Amino acid sequence: MNMKKFVCLILAIVCLFSLASCSLINKPDTPDEPDVPTLEAHKCESICDKCQKCLDAECSESVCAEKCQGHEPVSATYSFKVMSFNLDQAYGSDSTKRNRILDKILSEIPDLLGVQEETTAWADYLEETLKSEGYVRVGEFRSTSTSHAYYSYREASAIYYNVDRFELVDSGTFWLSPTPDVEGSVAGGWHSAALFPRVCTWVVLKDKLSGLEFAYFNSHFSYEHETLRNESAKLIISRIEELGIPAFFSGDLNFASNEETDTYAAITAVMDDSRTASPETMNGNTFHNYGYAAGESYGDGKCKTVPIDYIFATKGDFDAISFKILSETGDKGDVSDYYSDHFAIVANYQLTVVYER
Protein backbone atom coordinates (compact mmCIF):
# COMPACT_ATOMS: atom_id res chain seq x y z
CA MET A 1 0.00 0.00 0.00
CA ASN A 2 1.51 3.33 -1.02
CA MET A 3 1.60 6.34 1.27
CA LYS A 4 -1.30 8.17 -0.47
CA LYS A 5 -3.71 5.23 -0.01
CA PHE A 6 -2.62 4.82 3.60
CA VAL A 7 -3.34 8.49 4.39
CA CYS A 8 -6.80 8.24 2.73
CA LEU A 9 -7.63 5.17 4.80
CA ILE A 10 -6.65 6.93 8.02
CA LEU A 11 -8.75 9.98 7.11
CA ALA A 12 -11.77 7.79 6.31
CA ILE A 13 -11.51 6.04 9.68
CA VAL A 14 -11.29 9.39 11.48
CA CYS A 15 -14.40 10.64 9.64
CA LEU A 16 -16.37 7.55 10.55
CA PHE A 17 -15.48 7.92 14.24
CA SER A 18 -16.45 11.62 14.11
CA LEU A 19 -19.86 10.87 12.59
CA ALA A 20 -20.53 8.16 15.15
CA SER A 21 -19.63 10.53 17.98
CA CYS A 22 -21.98 13.24 16.66
CA SER A 23 -24.79 10.74 16.38
CA LEU A 24 -24.32 9.67 19.98
CA ILE A 25 -24.10 13.25 21.23
CA ASN A 26 -27.23 14.41 19.38
CA LYS A 27 -29.35 11.34 20.09
CA PRO A 28 -32.08 12.19 22.62
CA ASP A 29 -32.44 10.13 25.74
CA THR A 30 -35.16 7.55 25.20
CA PRO A 31 -36.70 6.02 28.29
CA ASP A 32 -37.24 2.28 28.40
CA GLU A 33 -41.00 2.79 28.59
CA PRO A 34 -41.86 6.12 26.93
CA ASP A 35 -44.66 7.98 28.67
CA VAL A 36 -46.90 8.54 25.66
CA PRO A 37 -50.40 9.87 26.40
CA THR A 38 -53.09 7.29 25.68
CA LEU A 39 -54.95 9.47 23.19
CA GLU A 40 -51.77 10.46 21.32
CA ALA A 41 -50.58 6.87 21.16
CA HIS A 42 -53.99 5.75 19.92
CA LYS A 43 -53.98 8.34 17.15
CA CYS A 44 -50.43 7.48 16.21
CA GLU A 45 -51.04 3.78 15.96
CA SER A 46 -54.22 4.41 13.96
CA ILE A 47 -52.42 6.61 11.47
CA CYS A 48 -49.32 4.48 11.11
CA ASP A 49 -50.79 1.02 11.36
CA LYS A 50 -50.19 0.26 7.68
CA CYS A 51 -46.54 1.22 7.50
CA GLN A 52 -45.59 0.01 11.00
CA LYS A 53 -43.60 3.13 11.78
CA CYS A 54 -43.87 5.94 14.29
CA LEU A 55 -43.74 3.72 17.35
CA ASP A 56 -40.99 5.63 19.12
CA ALA A 57 -41.10 8.09 22.01
CA GLU A 58 -41.53 11.10 19.71
CA CYS A 59 -44.79 9.76 18.31
CA SER A 60 -47.20 12.51 17.25
CA GLU A 61 -49.66 13.22 14.46
CA SER A 62 -47.19 15.36 12.52
CA VAL A 63 -44.42 12.79 12.82
CA CYS A 64 -46.81 10.05 11.79
CA ALA A 65 -47.91 12.02 8.77
CA GLU A 66 -44.33 12.56 7.65
CA LYS A 67 -43.27 8.95 8.13
CA CYS A 68 -46.38 7.48 6.55
CA GLN A 69 -46.49 9.55 3.37
CA GLY A 70 -47.89 7.61 0.48
CA HIS A 71 -50.42 5.76 2.62
CA GLU A 72 -54.14 6.50 2.67
CA PRO A 73 -55.54 8.48 5.64
CA VAL A 74 -56.63 6.17 8.43
CA SER A 75 -59.91 6.54 10.32
CA ALA A 76 -60.83 5.47 13.83
CA THR A 77 -64.34 4.74 15.10
CA TYR A 78 -65.50 5.43 18.64
CA SER A 79 -68.72 4.22 20.28
CA PHE A 80 -71.02 6.20 22.59
CA LYS A 81 -73.86 4.63 24.58
CA VAL A 82 -76.49 7.00 25.97
CA MET A 83 -79.22 5.93 28.41
CA SER A 84 -82.28 7.88 29.58
CA PHE A 85 -84.26 6.73 32.61
CA ASN A 86 -87.29 8.17 34.43
CA LEU A 87 -86.88 6.69 37.90
CA ASP A 88 -90.35 7.49 39.32
CA GLN A 89 -89.86 9.95 42.15
CA ALA A 90 -92.16 8.01 44.51
CA TYR A 91 -89.78 5.09 45.08
CA GLY A 92 -86.40 6.58 45.92
CA SER A 93 -86.45 4.98 49.36
CA ASP A 94 -87.71 1.58 48.21
CA SER A 95 -84.71 -0.78 48.44
CA THR A 96 -86.22 -3.32 46.04
CA LYS A 97 -86.91 -0.70 43.37
CA ARG A 98 -83.52 0.89 43.88
CA ASN A 99 -81.65 -2.38 43.42
CA ARG A 100 -83.64 -3.29 40.30
CA ILE A 101 -82.96 0.07 38.72
CA LEU A 102 -79.27 -0.11 39.59
CA ASP A 103 -79.09 -3.58 38.03
CA LYS A 104 -80.81 -2.27 34.89
CA ILE A 105 -78.30 0.58 34.57
CA LEU A 106 -75.28 -1.64 35.15
CA SER A 107 -76.55 -4.25 32.70
CA GLU A 108 -76.13 -1.62 29.97
CA ILE A 109 -72.99 0.15 31.30
CA PRO A 110 -73.81 3.42 29.49
CA ASP A 111 -71.16 6.02 28.81
CA LEU A 112 -73.74 8.72 29.56
CA LEU A 113 -76.84 8.42 31.73
CA GLY A 114 -79.62 10.98 32.04
CA VAL A 115 -82.22 10.45 34.78
CA GLN A 116 -85.51 12.19 35.50
CA GLU A 117 -87.56 12.45 38.71
CA GLU A 118 -84.40 12.09 40.76
CA THR A 119 -85.43 13.08 44.28
CA THR A 120 -82.91 13.55 47.08
CA ALA A 121 -83.43 9.91 48.09
CA TRP A 122 -82.69 8.74 44.56
CA ALA A 123 -79.69 11.07 44.26
CA ASP A 124 -78.18 9.94 47.56
CA TYR A 125 -78.47 6.31 46.52
CA LEU A 126 -77.37 6.56 42.88
CA GLU A 127 -74.52 9.00 43.44
CA GLU A 128 -72.97 6.71 46.05
CA THR A 129 -73.51 3.40 44.28
CA LEU A 130 -72.60 4.59 40.78
CA LYS A 131 -69.47 6.33 42.08
CA SER A 132 -67.99 2.92 42.85
CA GLU A 133 -68.75 1.94 39.24
CA GLY A 134 -66.82 4.89 37.82
CA TYR A 135 -69.62 7.45 37.33
CA VAL A 136 -69.78 11.08 38.44
CA ARG A 137 -73.07 12.92 39.03
CA VAL A 138 -73.86 16.44 37.80
CA GLY A 139 -77.16 18.21 38.49
CA GLU A 140 -79.09 20.65 40.67
CA PHE A 141 -82.52 20.18 42.20
CA ARG A 142 -85.26 22.27 40.66
CA SER A 143 -86.01 24.01 43.96
CA THR A 144 -85.01 23.94 47.61
CA SER A 145 -88.68 24.07 48.61
CA THR A 146 -90.29 21.05 50.26
CA SER A 147 -93.76 22.60 50.46
CA HIS A 148 -95.48 20.24 48.05
CA ALA A 149 -96.36 16.87 49.54
CA TYR A 150 -96.31 14.59 46.47
CA TYR A 151 -94.53 16.25 43.56
CA SER A 152 -91.35 16.97 45.46
CA TYR A 153 -89.81 20.27 44.48
CA ARG A 154 -86.45 18.72 45.31
CA GLU A 155 -86.20 16.82 42.06
CA ALA A 156 -83.37 16.79 39.52
CA SER A 157 -82.72 15.80 35.91
CA ALA A 158 -79.19 14.69 36.67
CA ILE A 159 -76.43 13.42 34.40
CA TYR A 160 -73.99 10.64 35.22
CA TYR A 161 -70.88 10.23 33.07
CA ASN A 162 -68.06 7.69 32.94
CA VAL A 163 -65.13 9.48 34.57
CA ASP A 164 -62.55 7.09 33.09
CA ARG A 165 -63.71 7.98 29.58
CA PHE A 166 -64.63 11.66 29.89
CA GLU A 167 -63.12 14.82 31.35
CA LEU A 168 -65.57 17.47 32.62
CA VAL A 169 -65.02 20.81 30.88
CA ASP A 170 -68.12 22.73 32.00
CA SER A 171 -71.58 22.11 33.45
CA GLY A 172 -74.71 23.79 34.69
CA THR A 173 -78.46 23.71 35.27
CA PHE A 174 -81.05 26.15 33.95
CA TRP A 175 -84.80 26.40 34.46
CA LEU A 176 -87.43 25.84 31.78
CA SER A 177 -89.03 29.25 32.08
CA PRO A 178 -88.85 32.74 30.55
CA THR A 179 -86.13 33.43 33.17
CA PRO A 180 -83.99 30.30 32.76
CA ASP A 181 -81.11 31.48 34.93
CA VAL A 182 -83.33 32.31 37.91
CA GLU A 183 -83.19 29.39 40.32
CA GLY A 184 -86.58 27.84 41.04
CA SER A 185 -88.42 29.88 38.40
CA VAL A 186 -91.74 28.50 37.14
CA ALA A 187 -92.88 28.87 33.52
CA GLY A 188 -96.04 30.81 34.34
CA GLY A 189 -94.97 33.42 31.82
CA TRP A 190 -95.33 30.80 29.09
CA HIS A 191 -98.64 29.38 30.32
CA SER A 192 -100.67 29.58 33.52
CA ALA A 193 -100.90 25.77 33.67
CA ALA A 194 -97.30 25.55 34.91
CA LEU A 195 -97.29 24.09 38.42
CA PHE A 196 -93.67 23.27 39.22
CA PRO A 197 -90.18 24.43 38.33
CA ARG A 198 -88.60 22.33 35.57
CA VAL A 199 -84.88 22.08 34.88
CA CYS A 200 -82.37 21.08 32.25
CA THR A 201 -78.91 19.92 33.31
CA TRP A 202 -76.01 20.03 30.86
CA VAL A 203 -72.35 19.13 30.69
CA VAL A 204 -69.53 19.76 28.26
CA LEU A 205 -67.19 16.77 28.21
CA LYS A 206 -63.94 15.90 26.48
CA ASP A 207 -63.69 12.33 25.26
CA LYS A 208 -60.29 10.97 26.30
CA LEU A 209 -60.32 8.44 23.43
CA SER A 210 -61.24 10.54 20.41
CA GLY A 211 -60.37 13.99 21.76
CA LEU A 212 -63.89 15.20 20.87
CA GLU A 213 -65.40 17.96 22.99
CA PHE A 214 -69.18 17.65 23.09
CA ALA A 215 -72.24 18.55 25.17
CA TYR A 216 -74.99 16.50 26.78
CA PHE A 217 -78.34 17.97 27.88
CA ASN A 218 -80.94 16.14 29.97
CA SER A 219 -84.42 17.31 30.99
CA HIS A 220 -87.98 16.47 32.05
CA PHE A 221 -90.70 18.47 30.31
CA SER A 222 -94.03 19.56 31.78
CA TYR A 223 -97.06 17.31 31.35
CA GLU A 224 -99.46 20.21 31.99
CA HIS A 225 -99.63 21.94 28.60
CA GLU A 226 -98.25 21.72 25.06
CA THR A 227 -97.14 25.37 25.10
CA LEU A 228 -94.85 24.66 28.04
CA ARG A 229 -93.24 21.74 26.21
CA ASN A 230 -92.86 23.70 22.99
CA GLU A 231 -91.18 26.64 24.71
CA SER A 232 -88.94 24.28 26.69
CA ALA A 233 -87.80 22.60 23.48
CA LYS A 234 -86.99 25.92 21.84
CA LEU A 235 -85.04 27.09 24.90
CA ILE A 236 -82.90 23.96 25.05
CA ILE A 237 -82.21 23.98 21.32
CA SER A 238 -81.12 27.62 21.56
CA ARG A 239 -78.65 26.70 24.33
CA ILE A 240 -77.30 23.82 22.25
CA GLU A 241 -76.83 26.09 19.25
CA GLU A 242 -75.07 28.70 21.42
CA LEU A 243 -72.42 26.15 22.38
CA GLY A 244 -71.80 25.30 18.73
CA ILE A 245 -70.37 21.83 19.40
CA PRO A 246 -71.73 18.30 18.88
CA ALA A 247 -74.40 17.45 21.45
CA PHE A 248 -76.74 14.81 22.81
CA PHE A 249 -80.11 15.60 24.37
CA SER A 250 -82.23 13.13 26.34
CA GLY A 251 -85.25 13.18 28.57
CA ASP A 252 -88.81 12.38 29.45
CA LEU A 253 -90.40 15.02 27.24
CA ASN A 254 -94.04 14.08 27.92
CA PHE A 255 -95.22 14.27 24.32
CA ALA A 256 -95.62 11.89 21.40
CA SER A 257 -93.90 12.83 18.16
CA ASN A 258 -97.00 11.97 16.13
CA GLU A 259 -99.18 14.35 18.17
CA GLU A 260 -97.16 17.46 19.08
CA THR A 261 -95.50 17.93 15.73
CA ASP A 262 -94.42 21.54 16.36
CA THR A 263 -92.48 20.63 19.51
CA TYR A 264 -90.91 17.63 17.80
CA ALA A 265 -90.02 19.76 14.75
CA ALA A 266 -88.35 22.40 16.94
CA ILE A 267 -85.92 19.73 18.15
CA THR A 268 -85.47 17.72 14.95
CA ALA A 269 -84.63 20.82 12.94
CA VAL A 270 -81.24 20.61 14.67
CA MET A 271 -81.05 17.07 16.05
CA ASP A 272 -81.86 13.53 14.89
CA ASP A 273 -84.14 11.28 16.92
CA SER A 274 -82.22 8.08 17.68
CA ARG A 275 -85.38 6.00 17.31
CA THR A 276 -86.01 7.06 13.72
CA ALA A 277 -82.37 7.53 12.71
CA SER A 278 -81.12 4.10 13.84
CA PRO A 279 -81.13 1.17 11.41
CA GLU A 280 -81.80 -1.09 14.39
CA THR A 281 -84.73 0.34 16.34
CA MET A 282 -87.84 -0.37 18.42
CA ASN A 283 -91.31 1.16 18.55
CA GLY A 284 -93.93 1.25 21.27
CA ASN A 285 -94.69 3.25 24.38
CA THR A 286 -92.12 4.13 27.02
CA PHE A 287 -94.59 5.41 29.62
CA HIS A 288 -96.73 2.39 30.58
CA ASN A 289 -97.97 3.48 34.03
CA TYR A 290 -97.15 0.03 35.42
CA GLY A 291 -98.32 -2.35 32.75
CA TYR A 292 -100.70 -0.56 30.39
CA ALA A 293 -100.21 -1.24 26.68
CA ALA A 294 -99.58 1.29 23.93
CA GLY A 295 -102.82 3.11 23.16
CA GLU A 296 -104.58 1.74 26.25
CA SER A 297 -106.47 4.05 28.60
CA TYR A 298 -105.82 4.20 32.33
CA GLY A 299 -107.64 6.42 34.83
CA ASP A 300 -107.76 9.87 33.27
CA GLY A 301 -104.95 9.21 30.80
CA LYS A 302 -103.94 7.11 27.83
CA CYS A 303 -100.61 5.48 26.98
CA LYS A 304 -99.06 6.75 23.77
CA THR A 305 -98.30 4.46 20.85
CA VAL A 306 -94.80 5.90 20.48
CA PRO A 307 -92.16 6.84 23.08
CA ILE A 308 -92.42 10.02 25.12
CA ASP A 309 -88.81 9.47 26.23
CA TYR A 310 -86.14 10.48 23.73
CA ILE A 311 -82.44 10.56 22.91
CA PHE A 312 -81.33 13.01 20.23
CA ALA A 313 -77.95 13.88 18.67
CA THR A 314 -76.98 16.91 16.61
CA LYS A 315 -77.25 16.30 12.88
CA GLY A 316 -74.13 15.15 11.05
CA ASP A 317 -72.03 14.63 14.17
CA PHE A 318 -72.83 11.07 15.23
CA ASP A 319 -74.07 7.95 13.43
CA ALA A 320 -77.06 6.40 15.21
CA ILE A 321 -76.57 2.63 15.30
CA SER A 322 -79.37 1.31 17.49
CA PHE A 323 -82.25 2.36 19.72
CA LYS A 324 -83.99 0.08 22.19
CA ILE A 325 -86.67 0.21 24.86
CA LEU A 326 -85.84 -1.81 27.97
CA SER A 327 -89.35 -3.17 28.40
CA GLU A 328 -90.65 -5.51 31.08
CA THR A 329 -93.80 -7.59 31.45
CA GLY A 330 -95.99 -8.06 34.49
CA ASP A 331 -99.49 -7.75 35.86
CA LYS A 332 -101.27 -4.56 34.92
CA GLY A 333 -101.21 -2.03 37.73
CA ASP A 334 -98.88 -4.10 39.90
CA VAL A 335 -96.16 -1.66 40.92
CA SER A 336 -93.94 -4.45 42.24
CA ASP A 337 -93.69 -6.08 38.79
CA TYR A 338 -91.92 -3.12 37.18
CA TYR A 339 -88.79 -1.12 37.92
CA SER A 340 -90.54 2.18 37.07
CA ASP A 341 -93.64 3.57 35.37
CA HIS A 342 -91.38 4.37 32.39
CA PHE A 343 -89.21 1.98 30.44
CA ALA A 344 -85.59 3.09 30.16
CA ILE A 345 -84.24 3.72 26.66
CA VAL A 346 -80.74 3.23 25.23
CA ALA A 347 -79.16 4.60 22.05
CA ASN A 348 -75.83 3.52 20.60
CA TYR A 349 -73.86 5.92 18.43
CA GLN A 350 -70.59 5.89 16.54
CA LEU A 351 -68.19 8.71 15.82
CA THR A 352 -65.71 8.30 12.97
CA VAL A 353 -62.57 10.44 13.01
CA VAL A 354 -60.35 10.61 9.91
CA TYR A 355 -56.75 11.57 10.63
CA GLU A 356 -55.59 13.55 7.61
CA ARG A 357 -51.98 14.07 6.54
Residue spans for each PLM region:
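Structured beta-strand-rich core segments of catalytic domains in phosphoester-bond hydrolases
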Residues: 117-213, 324-325
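Solvent-exposed loop/turn segments at secondary-structure junctions
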Residues: 87-92, 118-122, 142-146, 165-166, ...
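Active-site beta-strand/loop signature of hydrolases that rely on acidic residues for catalysis
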Residues: 80-87, 101-127, 160, 203, ...
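Positively charged n-region of N-terminal signal peptides that target proteins for export
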Residues: 1-6, 10-11, 23
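N-terminal, active-site-proximal structural segment of metallo-dependent hydrolase catalytic domains
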Residues: 23-26, 31-34, 65-132, 142-155, ...
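Secreted, short cysteine-rich peptides and small extracellular cysteine-rich domains stabilized by multiple disulfide
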Residues: 43-71
